[in-house]
Amino acid sequence: ILTKKNRVLPKEYLENLLNKLEIFKDLEKIFSKIIITDEENLGFGNFYWRLVRPFPYTDVGTMHKDKWFWDLGTGKMNNKIFKRYKLWISIKGEDKLGFKFVPGSANLNLDYKFELKDAKLKPVFDEKSLGKNKIHSLKGEKGTFILFNDELLHGGEVLHTHTPRVSIECTFQVKK
């Protein structure tokens, strides 16, 4: 399995996406200026791809808030000046796109543990503490996207299909 650092799109791809995808033009209208974050310290914004194989493989981690990664030392950003958002776009998938989330969770103060994996501290959350009825699956077709702040509890979803799920995503910051 490739680590996140090995899945970051090259800088020229990022510039191409930012110039060609309408969603980034729309985001600039809403937020004025967006800055794609560089969590992997590569010297440019990190837009990365993800491939998740179908069951029986479990190429997903536990549910998490992206904020927890930042709190544990991934990336550097002045939280007093900037707010973080995540953009997740389905490239290939079926009705259930492999993205699950808990509506309203940005307002919940949830406990988590952490582990050292791939030379980074990563949050570990016990999903059983939520109850299945609180977890929702994003549904749609390829091109479906979700934009959320970094305090939404979310994660990848193991799918019982015959084809893998492919997505691209990035975190961006805007001035408060």
Would you name each region that the model predicts?
Residues 58-138:
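Catalytic core of non-heme Fe(II) oxygenases with the double-stranded beta-helix
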Residues 54-56, 68, 92-95, 106-107, ...:
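Short, solvent-exposed loop/turn segments at secondary-structure junctions
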Residues 49, 87-89, 168-172:
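A structural signal for short, well-ordered beta-strand segments
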Residues 13-24, 80, 132, 136-140:
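Aromatic-acidic/polar surface patches that form glycan- and anion
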Residues 123-176:
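Catalytic core of Fe(II)/2-oxoglutarate
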Residues 47-49, 104, 150-152:
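Short, well-ordered beta-to-alpha junction loops that form the rim of enzyme active sites
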Residues 1-65, 69-71:
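Non-heme Fe(II)-dependent double-stranded beta-helix
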Residues 43, 81-83, 162-164:
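A short, structural micro-pattern
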